[in-house]
Regions:
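Catalytic-core environment of secreted peptidases
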Residues: 122-134, 353-424
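C-terminal subdomain of the subtilisin-like protease fold in secreted/lumenal serine endopeptidases
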Residues: 194, 435-514, 613-614
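Hydrolase catalytic cores
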Residues: 393-465
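C-terminal outer-membrane/trafficking sorting elements
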Residues: 640-718
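C-terminal edge strands of extracellular/lumenal beta-sandwich accessory domains
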Residues: 450-452, 540-547, 555-557, 582-584, ...
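Subtilisin-like serine protease catalytic core
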Residues: 18-22, 90-210, 219-227, 232-244, ...
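Secreted peptidase-domain scaffold signal
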Residues: 473-549, 618-633
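N-terminal domain-start motif of subtilase-like serine proteases
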Residues: 28, 40-121, 141-150, 268-280, ...
């Protein structure tokens, strides 16, 4: 009977997931159809406008340009089109990946190089599978038709993760930026034994299929366990060789009558919602996204390009006049230039740093202190407009030697910079952690929330204390993450998924000797935010929280009742150091006590309001990932009546009734190791049924209290 119930639950879960995906497919297909209708209208206007000019382009040229634009169209906003664009082995040592590749981590048997791991790469074209750096073309599967050209960018991004390695001596400079130095560079990737599926980020018909899909539909239908996305929307100032020639093009709104300008950097919009929908319906899909390379772009700080252009109300590019008030450069105040599409809640957004230098000016240094990490000048900065922390993490993105190719296919090499390269570094590390996780935990996979939690909890401090808008939660450290997985396997840390039910609190008691920081981090896959803004003035810097299920993490000193709160940013002054308080915008919460007093601490997770699902209906629970480190033991509960005989739950009866003559204040359930696994705070009731259906068979201790009474009882569940 129990087996039948388990099968029914599993089938029910799969059915619910499929229903969610079917609904999402219908919504996304309708959006894509509407998008192409908008583009068709836009194309007709462009053709008419071109034919009406004194010096029109040829019909073949205008159609070629429109065909490319149709492939990369992302969305329209107030009638204006926005397009996708690509964002352009020292990094192995910088992030301590070599410890995993070489098998030098205590507690792990053997080395890990991506064996058995597959990554889907969504990029600017097909990956050249025959490049010598991949060793074998069998490692690359191009999902696109042969009509999509090979891409040097896609090949380089894939090589960052999976290249076998190629050494090259190049001329660089010392820290002074002047003195020349010869350095040895290598293309070796994070996972030289992994395999890759290659997709074009634009609109296309996949090989063997008949229906055109955009990148979101390709992600939704292929359901990759791990995917890399080194591209994004072009927002704000963009240096382009556009229709008006080489210059800065303002990808936003501008009103010449009053000089008012708006952009959509930091705005949660269509692509963000779609990605959150996809991951919510498929919680084991880990999506990694580059933050963008727009920091500092604009005419104010780049005077060598004299042409500055904006779209008028008809969508025509016109030049700013000498009396126009130019929009500020991207991130002119040091923040707010991550584009929409990279601020989704359930993905991992990656910023870029310079390589860590050694004392002898090499590029293969290791992290030893905060000042080792330098922000890459181009790396886009957060936060999301409601103040949520973006990027989530930072990795090396500068001075990268990578395998490249021509559009026809060739083995070449290049050196480049960009969050395009920091993102696959993080993706590769997640792949290695996934391989380690499988080896330690019977082939199981990390889900999206747990993968993100592992990144954030083990990140090295960078920039301001706590999270910030340049580095997110810090600099990625592959070794620390692998070590934490070993500690989980040895039951030395808490790293698990838990369910929070409405109107309940989950509590864990831990004891520390005060010799190390006590840190807890929770991450959850949140329902998508259903935005309703469709004008620039409403969308620009919209401070409304995009969080749907607002979970709260607190750590309380049991002896003193002092409560410790999570990090948060000020949305109106996000470059200021993070403070601690009630975080109402992030689906990540972390509480850090740098110097805890020795004693017992209560780690509590609760929620505000009512939990809902992705359709907005009331949800029974919200699953979250929690990591706790820095404790020395998990204490037993205060009362365990060892002499009492357990109350046996009858077969099929999974509820225990608690009844007092006055209102019940608290109900708690412990396992026999003393770990608190359920905490309930009933609201103004004298009787309450405690549901044990979600617990495995075993003996539990139930405690309950009111103002003047206490109850403690052992429960045996078969």
């Amino acid at each position: 009977m129990r087996r039948s119930v388990l099968v029914a639950l599993l089938l029910g879960g799969l059915l619910n997931a499929q229903q969610g995906n079917d609904k999402l497919k219908k919504e996304m297909d309708e959006r894509r159809e509407q998008l192409f209708k908008q583009f068709e209208f836009y194309a007709h206007k462009q053709i008419y406008r071109n034919n009406s000019t004194d010096d029109p382009k040829s019909e073949s040229v205008i159609k070629r340009d429109l065909k490319k634009e149709r492939e990369t169209i992302s969305f329209f906003f107030e009638g204006m089109p926005y397009f996708l664009s690509a964002f352009d082995t020292d990094q192995i040592k910088n992030s301590n990946v070599d410890a995993i590749q070489e098998g030098t981590i205590d507690g792990l048997i053997g080395s890990f190089n991506g064996e058995g791991i597959k990554v889907s790469v969504f990029d600017g074209g097909r990956v050249y599978a025959k490049h010598t750096d991949f060793g074998s073309s069998a490692r690359i599967t191009n999902k696109e038709a042969a009509t999509i050209p090979y891409s040097g960018h896609a090949t380089g991004v894939t090589g960052m993760m999976g290249s076998k390695g190629h050494s090259l001596s190049v001329t660089s400079t010392k820290r002074d930026g002047v003195t020349p130095i010869i350095v040895e560079m290598n293309t070796k990737g994070m996972m030289p034994e992994a395999v890759f599926d290659s997709y074009y980020y634009g609109n296309s018909i996949l090989a063997g299929e008949t229906v055109e899909k955009d990148s979101s539909a390709k992600i939704r239908d292929s359901k990759p366990a791990l995917s890399n996305h080194s591209y994004g929307n072009v927002i704000g100032w963009s240096l382009e060789n556009g229709s008006m020639g080489v210059g800065f093009y303002w990808r936003g709104s501008y009103d010449p009558s009053n000089g008012r300008s708006y952009d959509l950097n930091g705005t949660y919009y269509g692509r963000d919602k779609e990605l959150d929908d996809i991951v919510y319906n498929n919680p084991y899909m880990v999506v990694v996204k580059s933050a963008g390379n727009s920091y500092g772009k604009g005419p104010t700080s780049n005077t060598m390009f004299p042409g500055y252009y904006y779209r008028d109300s008809d969508g025509t590019w016109v030049q700013f006049s000498s009396t126009d008030v130019l929009p500020p450069d991207n991130c002119a105040a040091g923040y707010d230039c991550i584009p929409m599409g990279a601020v989704a809640k359930n993905i991992i957004t990656v910023g870029a740093t310079e390589k860590i230098r050694t004392a002898s000016d090499g590029f293969d240094g290791r992290y030893t202190q905060v000042s080792d990490v330098k922000k890459a000048s181009y790396s886009s900065a957060g936060p999301r407009d409601d103040g949520a922390i973006k990027p989530d993490i930072a990795g090396v993105g500068s001075n990268i030697l990578y395998p490249s190719t021509s559009s026809a296919g060739s083995t070449t090499y290049n050196i480049g910079n960009g969050t395009s390269f920091s993102a696959p570094q993080v993706t590769g590390i997640l792949g290695l952690w996934g391989q380690i996780y499988k080896s330690l935990f019977a082939g199981k996979n990390l889900n999206a929330a747990s993968a993100k939690n592992l990144l954030i909890h083990t990140a090295q401090e960078a920039g301001n204390v706590g999270p910030d808008v340049w580095y997110g939660w810090g600099f990625v450290d592959a070794k620390k993450g692998a070590e934490l997985l070993v500690q989980k396997n040895q039951n030395k840390v808490i790293f698990e998924d838990k369910d929070l039910k409405n109107a309940e609190k989950n509590e864990i008691l831990v004891k520390t000797d005060g010799a190390q920081p006590l840190k807890a981090t929770i991450v959850w896959t949140d329902p998508s935010y259903k935005f309703n803004y469709n004008t620039y003035s409403a969308a620009h810097n919209n401070r409304t929280s995009k969080l749907v299920n607002d979970l709260d993490l607190r750590i309380t000193n049991v002896q003193t009742n002092e409560v410790h709160y999570p990090w948060k940013l000020d949305p109106n002054a996000p470059r200021n150091p993070a403070t601690k308080g009630d975080n109402t915008v992030d689906n990540v919460e972390q509480v850090l006590i740098d110097q805890p007093a020795a004693g017992v601490y209560k780690i509590e997770v609760s929620n505000k309001g009512t939990l809902v699902n992705n359709d907005g209906a009331n949800a029974e629970k919200q699953t979250y990932s929690i990591i706790v480190t820095g404790y020395t033991e998990i204490p037993s509960p205060e009362v365990i009546p060892a002499e009492a005989s357990p109350t046996l739950l009858a077969d099929g009866n999974n509820k225990v009734n608690v009844k007092f003559v006055e209102n019940i204040n608290s109900i708690k359930v412990f396992d026999m190791s003393g770990r608190l696994i359920r905490s309930i705070a009933p609201s103004s009731v004298q009787t309450y049924d405690v549901d044990f259906s979600g617990f495995p068979a075993g003996i539990y201790v139930l405690t309950a209290s009111s103002a003047n009474h206490k109850l403690s009882k052992k429960i045996r569940k078969q």
